[in-house]
A protein has these predicted regions:
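Surface-exposed binding/hinge segments that line
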Residues: 74, 117-159
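Alpha-helical secondary-structure segments
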Residues: 98-106, 132-138, 173-174, 201-204, ...
Length: 498
């Protein structure tokens, strides 16, 4: 199948379909498992939500934090974060008010909430509403990272009590959701009261799911879609060579392994470290990403960024002899069997799993692959129904605190992280980094964090990967955001034209 997909550019593709001015058809990698506003159900769902939901803050195309529903914000003398709302409207015609914002924060942080950012927003101790366009957030401790959490696409602002009108809530994004063809496509029309004058540039938008990555590429080449996400790595070279297409690629997302600490022997950090030392990252990059990646032997902190430290960068790198020694020390030196959860829907996940299976076998671990479709993989992960799992994602921001969802143990259960592993030292250091405003002191904290993570191995990072969008040459304005923010690129559809 891969060979056929790779050959498509050279075998007389169909004539490109005619384009309707003001309309964009976007090929997603999956139909969103859920459009619940505050849940993490994958990149396709996040992209779809960015069409009709927006938060207080978001990201500009250069990766900087920008205002969305808040036109400006500052930290007050008493330590509170103050947000000043712009004139904005929800899709039901009601004005966005501070009361809506307060209600959303309460819903996300509620004790029984399943929101992805519940733990982070529980740091907000008090919410004040001086007037309809101002909201003051007092945190339990000083927080340098609260604006980053509020820029997340997991923290959109919806109209108060609007679940009565829509299961997804009523948002204030650039497009209104007008039709859902379950498992197939989502249709949107431009919202004429969007808060940015002159935007969106498109009149209509269709997000259509192509779970088969080769069919997704073929649809772009044939002109059936104008833009695709998750360009498969085996197709990147041919797309770059196609005069009708443009590809935008950035490093940032990473592949990693998660563990179920309730299942022996993965409760033992020595076994988790052994798994790390057993896997040759270069083989993952070659098999899954056609060489378009960079090995990670510690935490996924990119070289050249302020908090990267070479001393910790390869502490968990490939060393099969050390892996065997650690397994023996943990009392499982004679080997054991386990199941590795991945998915057949994304080639990168499946291929990564195959390489991991091969390398773990070399140190005595018999691994059976479990390869359901993506929605099932998400459900199993959220329920903690796995032993060992392959995952690919991106940090929530380019700040080290953006790794909190992957390595903290005091956050809401999610398919993106390990389960049943308690790491209080890591949780303490993450909290300390959040409350420190001095960069030099934050660096000391994150150095210690890297050391503790290399000892406890709450996850095992494998490699950074190139992440690309591809589009017809006529598509203008779309931007692939840098580094960890690549999955926020859907934000720029508001400025995209055809």
């Amino acid at each position: 199948v891969i060979a056929a997909g790779a050959a498509l550019p050279f075998i007389g593709r169909p004539t490109r379909a005619a384009t309707t001015p003001g309309r964009l058809v976007f090929g997603l990698s999956s139909y969103p498992p859920s459009l619940a506003p505050w849940a993490n159900t994958g990149t396709a769902a996040a992209t779809a939500r960015l069409m009709f939901h927006r938060g207080l803050l978001g990201y500009a195309e250069d990766g900087s934090v920008r205002g969305e529903l808040a036109e400006r914000w500052e930290r007050a003398d008493d330590g509170a974060w103050v947000f000043h709302l712009r004139e904005a409207f929800f899709h039901n015609g009601k004005k966005v008010t501070a009361e809506d914002v307060a209600w959303c924060i309460e819903q996300i942080a509620a004790e029984k909430s399943t929101a992805y950012l519940r733990a982070q927003l529980q740091d907000i101790a008090k919410v004040e509403i001086p007037d309809a366009k101002t909201i003051r957030l007092h945190t339990k401790d000083p927080s340098v990272t609260l604006p980053l959490n509020l820029a997340s696409f997991y923290a959109p602002i919806i109209a108060k009590d609007s679940f009565k009108e829509s299961p997804h809530g009523i948002g204030a994004g650039p497009f209104m959701l007008t039709a859902e063809e379950r498992g197939v496509a989502l249709d949107f029309t431009a919202f004429d009261k969007f808060y940015r004058p002159g935007l969106p540039r498109l009149k209509t938008l269709r997000l259509i799911a192509y779970a088969d990555e080769n069919l997704r590429v073929a649809a772009l080449q044939a002109g059936d879609v104008d833009l695709i996400e998750y360009v498969p790595w085996q197709s990147m070279t041919s797309i770059e060579a196609d005069a009708n297409l443009t590809m935008q690629s950035t490093p940032g997302p990473f592949m990693y392994l998660t563990f179920n600490g309730r299942v022996k022997p993965f409760d033992d950090p020595r076994v988790r470290r052994a798994v790390a030392h057993a896997v040759k990252r270069e083989d993952v990059i070659k098999a899954a990403f056609f060489g378009r990646g960079t090995p990670i032997g510690g935490l996924p902190i990119a070289a050249g960024t302020p908090y990267y430290d070479a001393r910790f960068a390869d502490s968990l790198g490939y060393d099969p002899a050390k892996a065997k020694a650690l397994l023996a020390e943990a009392g499982v030196g004679t080997g054991f069997s386990c199941k590795l959860l991945s998915t057949a829907q994304y080639g990168m996940h499946k291929d990564t799993a195959a390489v991991v299976q091969q390398h773990l076998a070399a140190v005595g671990m018999g691994v059976e692959l479990v390869l359901p479709d993506w929605p099932t993989r998400v459900t199993l992960g959220n329920r903690g129904q796995f032993e060992l799992a392959v995952m690919g994602s991106s940090a929530d921001s380019n700040d080290p605190d953006g790794l909190t969802p992957f390595i903290a143990s005091n956050v809401t259960a999610s398919y993106v992280r390990s389960t049943g592993i308690s790491t209080p030292d890591i949780d303490r250091l993450l909290a300390a980094g959040r409350t420190e405003f001095e960069p030099a002191k934050r660096r000391v904290i994150y150095d210690e964090l890297q050391q503790k993570c290399n000892e406890q191995a709450p996850i095992v990072a494998l490699c950074f990967r190139a992440q690309a969008y591809a589009m017809a040459k006529r598509v203008q304005g779309f931007k692939n955001l840098p580094g960890a923010l690549t999955f926020y690129s859907g934000t720029t559809i508001e400025q995209t034209s055809t």
